Amino acid sequence: MPAKVVGLFRYPVKGLSAEPQASVDLHAGRGFPGDRAFALASPTNAFDEAAPVALRKTEFLMLARQEALARLQTAFDPASGHLSVLDRTRSLTKDIRTPDGRADINAFFAEFLPDDQKGRLPRLVTAPGHCFTDVGVHSPELMHAVSMLNLASVRDVEQRIGKHLDPHRFRANVLIEGLERWVENEWLDRDIMLGAVACKGARLTRRCPATEVNPDTATRDINVPQELMICMW
């Protein structure tokens, strides 16, 4: 079976849920459209929207530390500026282009702050051309990288550990079928075609504790980074 793309996903807000995409237009140096365009900065984070600089992911709310974020279903409509958040029995939809809308979003997410920051508010932040990818701290080019996931490799790990692994744990933009398992480890500095778009393998994704979180239960149930080390070596 020839390799093919079977899933396209963007994550409008860093650390929050995925939005499936039927198709996307990729352009050199611009990353995956609409991906990680927003983030929830911690109360002590001095991120400046007028002069954005890439910061470590620990400066923002993230699944690696706040696994409860996985219970949220979010959607962003660029045309209206509306960010919708569903948390089990309660929901919120606000226009984040307005100060009041952002203030309400900030207040909603206050409960997800770590204990040492309780009583304060996170800030929903964004900046034109800025992407809140984890690897953005390494270079401007990596800030706009597109993340790809080989589903054959995911199944290989599943078989070895005897547990189901939802591919959404890995928060990739592009899901690919039809490849040999772990062939992606050979893609560094190689040209890769996504449809008519030529990409180049930049680096292997270093998996963090966010992958430990089950997207269905919002609990940590598998030490994925450790299992990957065992499977790959």
Tell me the role of every PLM-derived stretch:
Residues 1-233:
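Metal-cofactor-dependent catalytic cores
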